[in-house]
């Protein structure tokens, strides 16, 4: 038990202490520190028991694991033997190596010599192989250059030159080859730069040309081949998209800037130019290996503007050739649409060039960022530089085509506003343009020997001319318009801006989008366009308009210059119009067209319209006053027309409203003749009452028929102008009120027109209509004033108390003059006014003359039977003249004649006549008749008797009125 306890103690001690040496030290410390021998013996006994226990346990374990232990011991013995053998072998090798070292040390000089000779021979062989390869470089280089595998050629040449200037520098036999390859290396970058420019400016744009040709073929198959605008401004799409990969890269090739410069690999089995993007990357990589990137960038910057100008020249020739092939002659047709075609082509080409530059610029940035160039701080160009040069070239082109230097305006009139007063060119402006029919040739000489030889010669000349550009077109250069060393597709002029403004504005938007400019910043081309239009074009248009209008309004008598028959026929008018009015209306239409063409400046053009119409209104007002004003005083007809009450009354009468309505549209009235007769009576009453018994002096009437004709022409012209301007302005206002669905069909919407301008335009149109109405009223009143002028003196100053003689058989001279004036007016008005207005002038005139003559009875001092006969003849001749004019019997003059025939009776007979025939005239008119009879006849009694007759007259009239009223009431009751 004690042994087991001791063993357990030591096992626990061992388990507590992982280190056996610690246990031994503990036991030794216990034995050495203990003073009692018994304790030591006890400790010793415990140790021995523990060791015995361990031996037993070990024996048991050995018995249990004998096989494994035996295998482990044998394996250990085998490993030990192998290690021992290896040590012995290593020892033997060391001894052998020491022996070899001693032997080699003895032969070291001979071995060193042989080793050096071997190295020298190997180097010589390598040099010989390299020399053989270098000798073949010129031939291989020529093959690579011919096949345009420039990257392989560059690598080959750079490697060869490095060898010749390095290891083979001392080889005298290679000096000529060294010079040759060095020279080729010095010039190779020029070839690469030239190829790069060819792809930048020719290959990139040739795709645009090819696409245009395909479009042209498609359109020629699907449309009428007759010459017409290739590009319709109204249907130009929204801003074009920049060239994408499908537009720029070759079929199956990589898209624009899809790869880095390091990824560019040259395939010797394929056409290197099949993929232009890849080919330009190869060129940049070759230039980088030649360390010519700075020279490349410099060349691109220096040649950029010149290359763009060459694109303009080639495009100009291309457009001219296209027009020539369509059978158009630029010098004859002078079509600005070809300029639009040219600009659209240039926009596409410049976009293609910009896209190509973005590719090249990306490659250049990659080359600068790598170790290919080994250059520091290489300053590249950017896309802003490209767009600036494109804008510069376009500015120069526009400067020429818009004739900003005014090289042509001094000698050539404006194509838009110039026309001769002869009328043919003037009428051509308003003529409807017939659609051009294709001109089918009857025969051609193209297959004759002369034509074949001439065509071959021209083709050879043009091939030589365009061999470098890669854009050989067909057609002679003679189709271009010469101008100061520059060739044009159309005649330069300021009006060309109207055709190209919207497409140019869209391209400017594309440029600003590409440059990332905000709304607050404009590109130079937009600034150029804005300055040109505001500072040059608008002023030039204003000057042209002023010159044209002043040419017809600043004459001595602008109201006498009429448009010719051709112009009237074209305009579809029945009566002559003032040439100045047509010029002004054409100017307004021209400005309205400009407003649509240059929609961004619509306010400026509308302001011009307002100013020109206001000026013309003032001109017409001045001319009107020059006719109707005499010595700071208006003639009576103009004064009455100006009077608001009289003019309002005249316009309220049915004859005025009937004039404004066609006869078939007038409302039908029962007893219309009585209604109109009542209106004539009201008009006559107002005019007679307004004038009174005053005599009209000659200076208060318009005696010159040409003045009346001028007023008639002014009326027709101003009314026509008012209608045309109202139509134009109504279309303008309507165009600003489109629904969203309609707006989607409008390409370039006009900006909203301010209400103030619209109000001004409407007021001007109304003013012209009011002036036209006033002219017509003056004519209407002037004819009637002439009647007053001649017929009032006839009663006041005429002698009708005459005896029967030859003199009594003649017409009164005043009546003859009045008839003459009326006939002259009729002749002038019939030629100058439309029929319904002519009728308005003369209808009702017989009623007025009848009223004047009847009212004039009170002014006769005395009248005899011969005087009555003469008066009746006067009335008859007036009636005859008016009947010939109005083509209707003037029954009102019968009424006047019957009034004077009534004076054949005595005073008492007159009263009996009233009783028998009823009341035909007013009480005042009967009183005037009785008074005149009392003055003219003898033995009719004194004043008392006369008063009795007048009283009897009143009674008769009252009785007749009562009878008439009773009859009327009876009719009503019966109904």
From Swiss-Prot:
Tissue: Expressed in the striatum (at protein level).
Modified residue annotations for Phosphothreonine: 238
Keyword Magnesium: no
Residue ranges of coiled coil: 32-114
Location in or out of the cell: Midbody, Midbody ring; Cell projection; Cytoplasm, Cytoskeleton, Microtubule organizing center, Centrosome
Phosphoserine modified-residue sites: 32, 226, 469
Biological process terms in GO annotation: membrane fission; mitotic cytokinesis; paraxial mesoderm formation; protein transmembrane transport; vesicle docking involved in exocytosis; vesicle tethering involved in exocytosis
InterPro entries, sorted: Sec8/EXOC4, Sec8_exocyst_N, Sec8_M
Segments for region (Disordered): 211-230
Keywords for this protein: Acetylation, Cell projection, Coiled coil, Cytoplasm, Cytoskeleton, Exocytosis, Phosphoprotein, Protein transport, Transport
Tagged with keyword Electron transport: no
Broad class of the protein's primary localization: other
Residues the record lists as N6-acetyllysine modifications: 9
One Gene Ontology cellular component annotation held by this UniProt entry: myelin sheath abaxonal region
Stretches with biased composition (Basic and acidic residues): 211-224
Subunit structure, as described in the record: The exocyst complex is composed of EXOC1, EXOC2, EXOC3, EXOC4, EXOC5, EXOC6, EXOC7 and EXOC8. Interacts with BIRC6/bruce. Interacts with MYRIP. Interacts with SH3BP1; required for the localization of both SH3BP1 and the exocyst to the leading edge of migrating cells. Interacts with SLC6A9.
Function: Component of the exocyst complex involved in the docking of exocytic vesicles with fusion sites on the plasma membrane.
Annotated family: Belongs to the SEC8 family.
Record protein name field: Exocyst complex component 4
Taxon lineage: Eukaryota, Metazoa, Chordata, Craniata, Vertebrata
Protein encoded by which gene: Exoc4
